[in-house]
C-alpha cells in the first residue's frame, strides 16, 4: 500500500521554521506524496532573525506566509500557509480543511493511497498545545509530534492514534501540567515577550528540527514510527529515545 501524507506544522519560529525548510528540501527530491501546511499568526520581528529562518527583508510579514514563499523560491516546492493563531480546536479544524484530501483512501495520479495525517507542534505556548492535545484526542487516526526546548535541553513527544486506538500518548501524559496552564494565548503575547521568558539558541532549534526531520523521514521512507519521547541536550551532544510501553499507563 502506498501512502499520502498530510503534514501540518504549527509554529514557524526557531524549531518549526527550520524543520519546515528541511522537510521541504527532503520532500522536493522524494518520490513520496505529501502536502504541507504552515500555521502561525506571528509576524517577523527584528529579534527573530538571529535564530529563525528569516531575513531583514521579511520584517513585518506573517511568518507562515514568508516561510512558504521562501521555501518555494529555494526548493521549488509548494507549501500552504495558514496565517492565523490557534485559539481553539475549531481554528485547527479550519486549518485542516485547507488540505486537498480528507478521505481515508484517496487516488493520486491514478494510484490508490492511504492518507496519513501528521500534526507537528513547534510552538512555545501551552495554550496552543492544549488546542493540539484536544485535536489529537478527537481524531481517530493521527500522528502528533510535539517539540519543546529551552536554551540547550528539550524533548519531542511522539503520540500515535490509529483506528480509534491510542498506540502512544501525547505530551500531556508525560507533562500533565500542560493542560492546567492558564497563561496567555499566543495571540495575546508578543514574540518578543516570549523570547524574554523562554530564551533559546539557534543550535538547539536546529537540533530539534533535525530530530523531527529524522522521525518524519523514517516514517515516509521506511513506513516506521515508534511512539515515545526523544530527550536531547544540544551542548552535551546527547539524544536519547524513550520508547513508550503500554504498561506505563498502569502506573498513572
Language-model segments: which ranges?
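Glycine-rich phosphate-binding loop and adjoining beta1-alpha1-beta2 segment
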Residues: 33-78
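A structured beta-alpha segment of the ubiquitous adenosine-cofactor-binding alpha/beta core
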Residues: 59-115, 123-127
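Glycine-rich adenosine-cofactor-binding loop
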Residues: 3-31, 37-45
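Glycine-rich phosphate/adenylate-binding loop
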Residues: 2-15, 19, 114-118, 123-252
Amino acid at each position: 500500500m502506498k501512502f499520502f501524507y498530510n503534514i501540518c506544522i504549527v509554529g514557524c519560529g526557531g524549531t518549526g521554521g527550520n524543520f519546515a525548510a528541511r522537510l521541504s528540501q527532503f520532500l522536493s527530491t522524494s518520490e513520496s506524496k505529501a502536502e504541507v501546511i504552515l500555521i502561525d499568526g506571528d509576524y517577523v520581528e527584528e529579534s527573530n532573525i538571529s535564530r529563525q529562518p528569516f531575513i531583514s527583508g521579511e520584517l513585518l510579514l506573517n511568518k507562515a506566509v514568508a516561510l512558504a514563499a521562501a521555501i518555494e523560491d529555494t526548493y521549488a516546492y509548494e507549501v500552504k500557509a495558514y496565517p492565523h493563531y490557534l485559539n481553539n480546536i475549531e481554528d485547527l479544524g479550519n486549518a485542516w480543511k485547507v488540505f486537498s484530501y480528507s478521505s481515508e483512501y484517496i487516488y493520486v495520479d491514478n494510484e490508490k493511497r492511504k492518507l496519513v495525517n501528521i500534526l507537528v507542534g513547534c510552538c512555545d505556548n501551552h495554550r496552543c498545545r492544549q488546542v493540539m492535545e484536544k485535536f489529537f484526542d478527537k481524531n481517530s487516526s493521527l500522528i502528533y509530534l510535539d517539540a519543546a526546548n529551552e536554551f540547550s535541553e528539550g524533548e519531542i513527544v511522539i503520540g500515535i492514534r490509529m483506528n480509534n486506538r491510542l498506540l502512544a500518548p501525547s505530551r500531556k501524559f508525560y507533562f500533565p501540567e500542560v493542560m492546567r496552564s492558564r497563561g496567555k494565548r499566543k495571540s495575546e503575547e508578543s514574540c518578543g515577550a516570549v523570547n524574554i521568558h523562554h530564551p533559546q539558541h539557534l543550535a538547539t532549534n536546529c537540533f530539534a528540527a533535525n530530530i523531527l526531520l529524522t522521525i518524519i523521514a523514517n516514517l515516509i521512507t521506511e513506513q516506521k514510527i515508534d511512539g515515545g519521547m526523544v530527550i536531547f541536550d544540544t551542548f552535551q551532544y546527547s539524544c536519547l529515545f524513550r520508547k513508550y510501553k503500554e504498561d506505563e499507563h498502569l502506573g498513572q
